[in-house]
Amino acid sequence: MIQAPRIAIIAGEASGDHLGAGLIQQLRLHFATAEFIGIGGDMMRSAGCQTWFDTSELAVMGLTEVLRHLPRLLKIRREFCKRALAWHPDVLIGIDAPDFNLTVERWFKQRHIRTVHYVSPSIWAWREKRAAKIGASVDRVLCLFPMEPPIYARYGIDARFVGHPMADEIPYQTDRATARTALGLPLLSPVLAVLPGSRHSEISQLGNTFLEAAGQLSEHLPGLHVVIPAANTQCKPLLAEQLSRSTLPVMHSHLLDSSARTAMLAADVVLVASGTATLEAMLLKRPMVVAYKVAPLTYRIVKTLKLLKINRFALPNILAGEDLVPELIQKDCTAPALCAALLDCFKHPQKVTALQNRYLQLHTQLRRNASTRAAEAIAELLQQR
């Protein structure tokens, strides 16, 4: 029985640093004298992990940026693997960032070191056969969604549903009034939150259409306030430029620095790009309209090659197995269509109440004390040695 395991953790993104810190805290309840090294950020360091590289050094997005930084990323991977192997870890845990982590995990597994991948890639959405490659890299997968372990089971891979950390963080009942006060919004006016994505390409595709829809909505809802949280500093100039050309009343439109959760909390309804933000809006119990649009050539390739295996895109709909919220994709993503769907949310409170009850059921399903369950699954794996 291992009393003081050596645990290596790699968090390739800021969200992974957050997950890693919670995991370390829970693992210490199982192994008080455990040692932790890895790649992480401030939160993992505060939890007691000695980081050899910072998470920010791995955080690159987009093909061109990855290619530009590839020599540096390969050097980090090479140096980490060599140094970590010499440290003799009992287990290596990769958190999300599959492009980097799965290769490292496989390298360690081939050297008979236990490996765990925390946060499954979206194999339920596309390229399910990746599960076999993941299984060749890890001894156990820790999944955030309940539909994931059955897919891995078809490939004979040990996968555990641990719940979603965001469902643990967000309370079942949320406080709209406090959020509005924090943002300086009137308590009784209608409020729409607009989230067209976190990447430049997403905002280029969706931003103008979203703002046009919000402008049309304001004609139906006098006094409507629109809050637009910029996901990061890189996005804000583009959003500001799009907002300046929109028909939204200047006094009632609010471009924010980040604050996405506060913006959604303050809102009556959310207009959001398909992605993780839809899950957050669901957990905050906000009715939403979900939209997405990619370049026409990309969409044709995906459809022709049948790369996607889902017919729903919004996470609330995928989790529910039914159409809880409107989805407007590609040619259906027009300002009039978005405006009509948003207006329906504002005008039918009885529908909103039923929707929020369904949200609560899904929230309960996802709230599992993820860090605790993840630590238990890793501790169990360590005791099998």
Curated annotation (Swiss-Prot):
Give the InterPro entries listed for this entry: Glyco_trans_19 (IPR003835)
From the UniProt record, list the reaction(s) this protein catalyses: a lipid X + a UDP-2-N,3-O-bis[(3R)-3-hydroxyacyl]-alpha-D-glucosamine = a lipid A disaccharide + UDP + H(+)
Q: What is this organism's lineage?
A: Bacteria, Pseudomonadati, Pseudomonadota, Gammaproteobacteria, Lysobacterales
Q: What pathway, per the record?
A: Bacterial outer membrane biogenesis; LPS lipid A biosynthesis
What GO biological process terms does the UniProt entry carry, in alphabetical order? Answer: lipid A biosynthetic process
> What PANTHER family would the database entry show?
LIPID-A-DISACCHARIDE SYNTHASE, LIPID-A-DISACCHARIDE SYNTHASE, MITOCHONDRIAL-RELATED
Arranged from A to Z, the UniProt key words for this protein are: Glycosyltransferase, Lipid A biosynthesis, Lipid biosynthesis, Lipid metabolism, Transferase
Q: What does this protein do?
A: Condensation of UDP-2,3-diacylglucosamine and 2,3-diacylglucosamine-1-phosphate to form lipid A disaccharide, a precursor of lipid A, a phosphorylated glycolipid that anchors the lipopolysaccharide to the outer membrane of the cell.
Species per Swiss-Prot/TrEMBL record: Xylella fastidiosa (strain Temecula1 / ATCC 700964)
Q: What class of enzyme is it?
A: transferase
> Per its record, how is this protein called by name?
Lipid-A-disaccharide synthase
UniProt keyword annotation of Lipid biosynthesis present: yes
Q: Name one GO cellular component term.
A: membrane
- Residue ranges annotated as transmembrane are none
Any one Gene Ontology MF annotation carried by this entry is: lipid-A-disaccharide synthase activity
Q: Tell me the NCBIfam families matching this sequence.
A: lpxB (TIGR00215)
Q: Which HAMAP family match?
A: LpxB (MF_00392)
Q: Its Enzyme Commission number? A: 2.4.1.182
* Family named by the database record: Belongs to the LpxB family.
